[in-house]
Amino acid sequence: MSRLATVQRTTTETDIEIRLNLDQPEFEAPATGHGFLDHMLDALARHSRLGLSVRASGDLHIEPHHLIEDAGITLGQALTQALGDRRGIERYGSAFVPMDETLAHVVVDLSGRAHLAFEPETLDVWGQAGGMTHYHLREFLRGLCNHGGVTMHVRLLAGREAHHVIEAIVKALARALRDAVALTSDQLPSTKGSL
């Protein structure tokens, strides 16, 4: 079974192509035109050990929101395509990741049902990282959840500095996804018989 996907998303605001391979960790350096988003996508690929290629352009002269959100949407679509009927996947993943003073916890369920609980939006996270805030990250994750059929809970246990908060969350997501997409049986991981 091949767990590959290529998704192209073009709007008046962005043009994004994502290639995803759930079983081969070969990836290309992301090229979105937004340095910090590239850094986070690189971290996502490396720590999830998934093959990921992201080529994108967008209306960065306005603000990075559209590009970041649409990258999440496109990644969610690629994840849905690559997972197929989700037969045999572990389904759940959870990871804690520290980054200096920051500690993030991310839990995912690849149930096919979309939900994002994003605790950092209720906290006082300071500043931005390369023009990206934790609110931008929330929109990326919301797009991923809505279009990838992912239930995700994001908790921030310590830390307030935006760069460390965003990076710890992305790395925790990567490690949780790595576990959740793993093939561990030939059954659908559901008492309903479908996901």
Curated annotation (Swiss-Prot):
The Gene Ontology biological process annotation of the record reads: L-histidine biosynthetic process
Species the sequence originates in:
Deinococcus deserti (strain DSM 17065 / CIP 109153 / LMG 22923 / VCD115)
What is the protein's name according to its record?
Answer: Imidazoleglycerol-phosphate dehydratase
Sorted alphabetically, the keyword list is: Amino-acid biosynthesis, Cytoplasm, Histidine biosynthesis, Lyase
Its annotated compartments are: Cytoplasm
Q: Which PROSITE patterns match?
A: IGP_DEHYDRATASE_1 (PS00954), IGP_DEHYDRATASE_2 (PS00955)
Instruction: Identify the gene encoding this protein.
Output: hisB
Quote the InterPro entries the UniProt record gives.
Answer: IGPD_sf, ImidazoleglycerolP_deHydtase, ImidazoleglycerP_deHydtase_CS, Ribosomal_Su5_D2-typ_SF
Asked whether the UniProt record includes Amino-acid biosynthesis among its keywords, one would answer yes
Q: Which Gene3D superfamilies match?
A: Imidazole glycerol phosphate dehydratase, domain 1 (3.30.230.40)
Q: Which reaction does it catalyse?
A: D-erythro-1-(imidazol-4-yl)glycerol 3-phosphate = 3-(imidazol-4-yl)-2-oxopropyl phosphate + H2O
- Cite the EC number: 4.2.1.19
Similarity comment: Belongs to the imidazoleglycerol-phosphate dehydratase family.
Q: Which SUPFAM superfamilies match?
A: Ribosomal protein S5 domain 2-like
PANTHER family named among the record's database cross-references: IMIDAZOLEGLYCEROL-PHOSPHATE DEHYDRATASE, IMIDAZOLEGLYCEROL-PHOSPHATE DEHYDRATASE HIS7
